[in-house]
Amino acid sequence: MSTTEAVVIKVGIADVKIARFPDTIRTSGLGSCVGLVLYDKEKQTAGLVHVMLPDSTLSKTAELNRAKYADTAVQTTIDMLIEAGCRKFALKAKLAGGSEMFKFKSTNDLMKIGPRNVLAIKEQLSLFNIPIISEDTGGSSGRTIEFEPKSCMLHIRTVKQGEKTI
């Protein structure tokens, strides 16, 4: 009889990966970036994407990293989850990050990357009719998040506020 040991799947910046129970999925370094988890509770499967920027139209490279931008990352994560056996109608979302790590004297909204990332992700989730179950966004602290596909709990660690689960 073989037993498989749970693995923590690490998601880098501008990266997306899928995890199935018993594994968990984690990303760190969420400042203005947003960690978006899409999951199918019944399938005990989740995708985590580490979004850096709100809009891919500003990309100056020919080869687009679809995980990097909110407007392409949501679709990419959905596609990966469906390929992994999840059902689009069953997908739910949790998100964390989108901090304003540095305060600028400018009133220019272009400098507010964190809030713009959160807004862009919410717009995409709305387009796909995916409900946001919970979020921990904004503020001025960086975050590390880890999601458990079986319990659907998102554990959040910050330096200033400590730990919480949503």
Curated annotation (Swiss-Prot):
Reported phenotype of the disruption mutant: Cells exhibit poorly methylated receptors, are tumbly and have a decreased sensitivity to attractants.
UniProt entry keywords in alphabetical sequence: Chemotaxis, Hydrolase
EC main group: hydrolase
Entry's transmembrane regions: none
The reaction(s) this protein catalyses: L-glutaminyl-[protein] + H2O = L-glutamyl-[protein] + NH4(+)
Highest rank taxon of the organism: Bacteria
Gene Ontology MF terms: protein-glutamine glutaminase activity
Biological processes per GO annotation: chemotaxis
PANTHER family: CHEMORECEPTOR GLUTAMINE DEAMIDASE CHED-RELATED
Known function: Deamidates 'Gln-593' and 'Gln-594' of the chemoreceptor McpA. In addition, deamidates other chemoreceptors, including McpB and McpC. CheD-mediated MCP (methyl-accepting chemotaxis proteins) deamidation is required for productive communication of the conformational signals of the chemoreceptors to the CheA kinase. CheD is absolutely required for a behavioral response mediated by McpC but is not required for the response to asparagine mediated by McpB. CheD is necessary for the generation of wild-type prestimulus CheA autophosphorylation levels. Also required for methylation of MCPs by CheR.
Protein name per UniProt: Chemoreceptor glutamine deamidase CheD
Native organism: Bacillus subtilis (strain 168)
Gene designation per UniProt: cheD
